Amino acid sequence: MQARYSVSDPNALGVVPYLSEQNYYRAAGSYGGMASPMGVYSGHPEQYGAGMGRSYAPYHHQPAAPKDLVKPPYSYIALITMAIQNAPEKKITLNGIYQFIMDRFPFYRENKQGWQNSIRHNLSLNECFVKVPRDDKKPGKGSYWTLDPDSYNMFENGSFLRRRRRFKKKDVPKDKEERAHLKEPPSTTAKGAPTGTPVADGPKEAEKKVVVKSEAASPALPVITKVETLSPEGALQASPRSASSTPAGSPDGSLPEHHAAAPNGLPGFSVETIMTLRTSPPGGDLSPAAARAGLVVPPLALPYAAAPPAAYTQPCAQGLEAAGSAGYQCSMRAMSLYTGAERPAHVCVPPALDEALSDHPSGPGSPLGALNLAAGQEGALGASGHHHQHHGHLHPQAPPPAPQPPPAPQPATQATSWYLNHGGDLSHLPGHTFATQQQTFPNVREMFNSHRLGLDNSSLGESQVSNASCQLPYRATPSLYRHAAPYSYDCTKY
C-alpha cells in the first residue's frame, strides 16, 4: 500500500489521505499496530457484553416505541367497548379499562391524565354504557361498567372504526317496533299464498298454449315439443320445459340467424361448414395453407359483407393489364391487406356459386369474377380451371401442360425478389400464400400456378415442366406462430 500511494503528498487522492496517514504513523512497526486495537476489544469482552445486556433489559419495548406512538384510529367509545367485551363477565371497572387500553395500545402509556379524563367523560355521557354497582362480597372499590343490551350492534359489521349512530335510550322502542314490522310481512304472505295459487294456474295454462302453438307454427324449425295435458299438475310440470325450450326453439331466437345469412347468398356460417370444407375440399386440391386459413380466420368474417372485395380487387385487374408483372405483384400484395378479413366469406362459397363463376372467363371484369379472384388468391379454391380463368389476361388459351414462356425482364424480377426471398417460410401465412418459392421466378405464371396445385405430396404439374428451379423447399407442416421474415405479418391478427 505504501508503494502505490506516496506518503509525501497525502492530498494527491481524495480517499487516500486517511490510509496514508495511518501508514505514516505505523511505519516504524510492521504489523504490530494491528494487534493493539484488537487487544483493546478482546481484553475486556465481558465488560461490553454485560453492559449491553444490562442497559437494554429493562427497556425491551423501546426499540418499537417510535412506530407504536401513532394514535390508534379508534374512538374512546370503541376503546371502552373493546375493554368491556374482552372482560370475562362483560363488565369491567374503570381501572380495568385503563389497564386494557395501555396493554393493547402503547400510545396511551404516556399522557395518562389526558386520555383517562376523556375515558371518564365518555363513560358518563354515553347512554350505551351502564354503571353496575359492586357487590359487597367482592373486595375492591369502584363500580363496574357494562354495555347496554340494545347497544351491542352500534358498530357496523363488528368493526370498531365506524359507528352506525349515537345510541340513545329513547330510540330503543322505535327500533323494536321496526323489527316487529319487518318480521310480520313474511308470515302474512305465507298465509295468503295457498289462496292465490288457483288463480295463478290460469295464466300458466294460457302461456303454455301460446308457446306450443308458436313452436308448431314455425315450419323452418325442426324442434318438436311434447304437448302435455292441461291439468293443473301437468301445467305446473310443463311450464319449466316450455320456458327452457323457448330460447332455443322459438322463432325469436333462431330465425334471425337464418335471415342474417340470407342477404349474402351464402349458406349459414357455422363450424360444421368449415369442418366439411377442411375434411372434403372441392377437387381435393385444397392446400394446407388454405385449410389452415379456414380454421384461423373465421372469427373475422362476421362483420364484413360479401360485396366489398369487388371494390378492392378492381385496381388489381387494372394493375395487371397496365403495369405488367411487377405491378401485378405489388397490387396483389396490396390487395392481400384488404381481403385478409373478408377471406372466410370466400372459403364458404357453395359449389353452385363456384360453377357459376367458372363460366365467366372475363375474370376480374365483373364483381363476381373479382370475388372469385380474391378467393383464388387465397388458395382455398385450388382447382385448375379456376386458376386458368384468373390469369386469362396473360395466357388466354394456355393448355395445362404449357411450354416454357419467354422469361420476363430481369429488372422486374429483381424488383420483386424481396417479396419472394422467404417464400417457403411465408407459405403458412394466409395473406402471403402466393409467394412460395425462395428463388425468383422467370415469369408471373409459374409464380401463381405453383402454389395452387397442392404443395404437399401431389404432383406439381406445370410448374415442374418448365425448369428444375421450381423444386419447392416446402415444409410439410410449418408452425402457425413462427415468424418467417422481418417484413412478414399475419393479416388475421389485426
From Swiss-Prot:
Q: Where is the composition biased (Basic and acidic residues)?
A: 170-184, 202-212
> Does the keyword field hold Nucleotidyltransferase?
no
Post-translational modification remark: Phosphorylation regulates FOXC2 transcriptional activity by promoting its recruitment to chromatin.
Question: Which stretches are tagged as biased composition: Polar residues?
Answer: 239-248
Residues annotated as carrying Omega-N-methylarginine in the record are R278, R292
Q: List the Pfam families.
A: Forkhead
State a GO cellular component annotated for this protein: nuclear body
Positions of modified residues (Asymmetric dimethylarginine): R452
Q: Composition bias, kind Pro residues: at what positions?
A: 397-410
**SUPFAM superfamilies, A to Z:** Winged helix' DNA-binding domain (SSF46785)
Where is the crosslink of kind Glycyl lysine isopeptide (Lys-Gly) (interchain with G-Cter in SUMO2)?
Answer: K183, K213
Q: Which GO terms describe its molecular function?
A: chromatin DNA binding; DNA binding; DNA-binding transcription activator activity; DNA-binding transcription activator activity, RNA polymerase II-specific; DNA-binding transcription factor activity; DNA-binding transcription factor activity, RNA polymerase II-specific; identical protein binding; promoter-specific chromatin binding
| Name the record gives this protein | Forkhead box protein C2
Organism annotation: Mus musculus
Lineage of the native species? Eukaryota, Metazoa, Chordata, Craniata, Vertebrata
